[in-house]
């Protein structure tokens, strides 16, 4: 498979792009974790930014819901943010202080689900702003990314508890220990094979877990690659960012890994998403947005 990578510099210096998603308008929307803005980039590379009302909010992960609204986590301010396509913001304060919300996804019930890193909880917010929090067995588990599984449950990584968690829309929780000790799971996604896939930022592996809890692990070729985010691909594969390896990588459902080097050194890639046209876009904390095009 041949690819090309283009990179677009964000207008504002030291904006710190982190999360990224495809909007209903076809553009890419991303969080500027350091710049305290939500950014938008179109297919030609034109970038606009929208300041977040709360100062130093620490915007991290971002999604676009079925109606087109953008939802994002505010790690520093313990809020969930909502933004319309025309730049109107609403912010919802979490009941728990210093919750550090991080991962976010839309649930099968139409609500938005998110993780609370600092207090070991999974949160749920309705489109009208009503918030419910579910406590995990270990309050120090550091839940990170979260995704919707094809079984209708929400699956999440527990970075400091070395487990993959599963929570139903009723709040019922199950946990599955990862074979590699202290693996540091972070990104998680529902794969094209129906299983749940996740990255191990310390274990340097990609993991796969079935709904029965059976886990397989695949070693990343580059040492200390520090994989971060992962998403399903278009050809029975998944793609993930290597924060330490400075690469965008592909893993097939059979576990074969291919790595592609980012042109900019120390780009610090984090969030990653696919556009409908098949291009893959990713956020680089070095103040750029990357675009990977598959040639063959």
From Swiss-Prot:
One Gene Ontology molecular-function label: magnesium ion binding
Residues where substrate binds: 228
Residue positions of the active site: 270 (proton acceptor)
Binding residue positions for Mg(2+): 268, 285
Keyword check for Metal-binding: yes
GO biological process, one term: response to antibiotic
This protein's UniProt keywords: Antibiotic resistance, Lyase, Magnesium, Metal-binding
EC class (word): lyase
Subunit structure: Monomer.
Function summary: Inactivates the type B streptogramin antibiotics by linearizing the lactone ring at the ester linkage, generating a free phenylglycine carboxylate and converting the threonyl moiety into 2-amino-butenoic acid.
Family annotation (PANTHER family): VIRGINIAMYCIN B LYASE (PTHR40274:SF3)
Name of this chain's protein: Virginiamycin B lyase
Organism expressing this protein natively: Bacillus mycoides (strain KBAB4) (Bacillus weihenstephanensis)
Lineage: Bacteria, Bacillati, Bacillota, Bacilli, Bacillales
Gene: vgb
């Amino acid at each position: 498979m041949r690819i090309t990578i283009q990179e677009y510099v964000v207008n504002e210096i030291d904006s710190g792009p982190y999360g990224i998603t495809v909007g209903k308008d076809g553009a890419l929307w991303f969080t500027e974790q350091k710049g305290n803005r939500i950014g938008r980039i179109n297919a030609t590379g034109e970038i606009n930014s929208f300041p977040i009302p709360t100062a130093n909010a620490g915007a991290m992960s971002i999604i676009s819901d079925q109606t087109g609204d953008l939802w994002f986590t505010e790690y520093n301010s313990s809020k969930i943010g909502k933004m319309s396509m025309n730049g109107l913001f609403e912010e919802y304060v979490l009941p728990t202080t210093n919750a550090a919300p991080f991962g976010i996804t839309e649930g099968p019930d139409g609500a938005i689900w998110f993780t609370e890193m600092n207090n070991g909880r999974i949160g749920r917010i309705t489109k009208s702003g009503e918030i419910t929090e579910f406590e995990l067995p270990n309050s120090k588990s550091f839940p990170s990314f979260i995704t919707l599984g094809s079984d209708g449950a929400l699956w999440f990584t527990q970075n400091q508890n070395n487990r993959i968690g599963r929570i139903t829309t009723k709040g019922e929780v199950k946990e599955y220990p990862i074979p590699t000790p202290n693996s540091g799971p972070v990104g998680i996604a529902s794969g094209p094979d129906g299983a749940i896939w996740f990255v191990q930022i310390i274990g340097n592996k990609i993991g796969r877990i079935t709904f029965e809890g059976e886990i397989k692990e695949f070693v990343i070729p580059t040492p200390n690659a520090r994989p971060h985010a992962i998403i399903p691909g278009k050809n029975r594969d998944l793609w993930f960012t290597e924060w330490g390896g400075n690469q965008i990588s592909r893993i097939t459902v059979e576990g074969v890994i291919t790595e592609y080097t980012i042109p900019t050194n120390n780009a610090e890639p984090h969030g990653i998403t696919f556009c409908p046209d098949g291009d893959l876009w990713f956020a680089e904390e070095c103040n750029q947005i990357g675009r990977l095009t598959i040639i063959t």
